């Protein structure tokens, strides 16, 4: 691999041109061994170009400075991007990463894919220092199939249409905490969906006979042959008793007095 240099800076970063000519390999050799140097540079170049995220151009019109109390002001200013709904940290006044100060200064002086390349290098150096694998592609995922193998065709619910066990349960609708969710099963072979099976009522002859016998005894002990209670009389109308008098509107003529 040819030597990698950071040489493209913006016009307002002329003060960092001395750092731009620094060989990346000479800088990285201060932190990592030569055995991990080539792999780290190759990985950082690949990931920085593949997962590069374009920075959002912020202006004063869409940035709102948040206010903090003096007891919470620890030297870090926060900005809120109201247009893009983002909150991020900027202008750190507390010195961080003093061990990697040279590399951090290069990150601050660059932009674009070169900045992402240096950030990946810094991340990889820290992982190597801690003895952790920095390349996520080399990390083996833990298989929990022995414990949570819920999609095993051996135990799946068979499809009533094609009798296949290549089915998947899906939660269609969630409801309140005291109500069961709406669950449907989808068959991957015939592309049909069906309701989950329900438990059938288990009937035991002995239990049924015993319950019927108990019900007979209860009806013999407590017969319900008593006559119904008499109907209560209808309440008297308040108008008939003179409790409510007829009213009239003020625009109407007053009622004539009975002589």
From Swiss-Prot:
Zn-finger (TFIIS-type) residues: 155-195
EC number: 2.7.7.6
The keyword Metal-binding is annotated on this UniProt entry: yes
Pro residues: compositionally biased ranges: 226-236
Sites where the protein binds Zn(2+): 159, 162, 187, 190
Induction data: Expressed in the early phase of the viral replicative cycle.
Any one GO cellular component localisation term in the record: virion component
Region of interest called Disordered, as start-end residue ranges on this chain: 214-259
Keyword tags: DNA-directed RNA polymerase, Early protein, Host cytoplasm, Metal-binding, Nucleotidyltransferase, Transcription, Transferase, Virion, Zinc, Zinc-finger
Function: Part of the DNA-dependent RNA polymerase which catalyzes the transcription of viral DNA into RNA using the four ribonucleoside triphosphates as substrates. Responsible for the transcription of early, intermediate and late genes. DNA-dependent RNA polymerase associates with the early transcription factor (ETF), itself composed of OPG118/D6 and OPG134/A8, thereby allowing the early genes transcription. Late transcription, and probably also intermediate transcription, require newly synthesized RNA polymerase.
Family: Belongs to the poxviridae DNA-directed RNA polymerase 30 kDa subunit family.
Assembly and interaction partners: The DNA-dependent RNA polymerase (vRNAP) consists of eight subunits encoded by early viral genes and termed according to their apparent molecular masses Rpo147, Rpo132, Rpo35, Rpo30, Rpo22, Rpo19, Rpo18, and Rpo7. The same holoenzyme, with the addition of the transcription-specificity factor RAP94, is used for early gene expression.
Name used for this protein in its record: DNA-directed RNA polymerase 30 kDa polypeptide
Source organism of the structure: Vaccinia virus (strain Ankara)
């Amino acid at each position: 691999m040819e030597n990698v240099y950071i040489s493209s800076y913006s016009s307002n970063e002329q003060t960092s041109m001395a750092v731009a000519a620094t060989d990346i390999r000479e800088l990285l050799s201060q932190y990592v061994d030569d055995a991990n140097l080539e792999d780290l540079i190759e990985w950082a170049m690949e990931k920085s170009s593949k997962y590069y995220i374009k920075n959002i151009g912020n202006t004063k019109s869409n940035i709102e400075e948040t206010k903090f109390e003096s007891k919470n002001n620890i030297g870090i200013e926060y900005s809120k991007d109201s247009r893009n709904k983002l909150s991020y940290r900027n202008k750190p006044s507390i010195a961080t990463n003093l061990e990697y100060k040279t590399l951090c200064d290069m990150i601050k002086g660059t932009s674009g894919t070169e900045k992402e390349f240096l950030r990946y290098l810094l991340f990889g150096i820290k992982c190597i220092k801690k003895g952790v694998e920095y390349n996520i592609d080399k990390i083996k995922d833990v298989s929990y199939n022995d414990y949570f193998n819920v999609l095993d065709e051996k135990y799946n619910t068979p499809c009533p249409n094609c009798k296949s066990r290549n089915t998947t349960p899906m939660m269609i609708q969630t409801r309140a905490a005291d109500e069961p969710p709406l669950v449907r099963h989808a068959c991957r072979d015939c592309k049909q969906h069906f309701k989950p099976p329900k438990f059938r009522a288990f009937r035991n002859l002995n239990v049924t006979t015993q319950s019927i016998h108990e019900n007979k005894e209860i009806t013999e002990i407590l017969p319900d042959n008593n006559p119904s209670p008499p109907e209560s009389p209808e309440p008297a109308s308040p108008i008939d008793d003179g409790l409510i008098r007829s009213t009239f509107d003020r625009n109407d003529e007053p009622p004539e007095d009975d002589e």
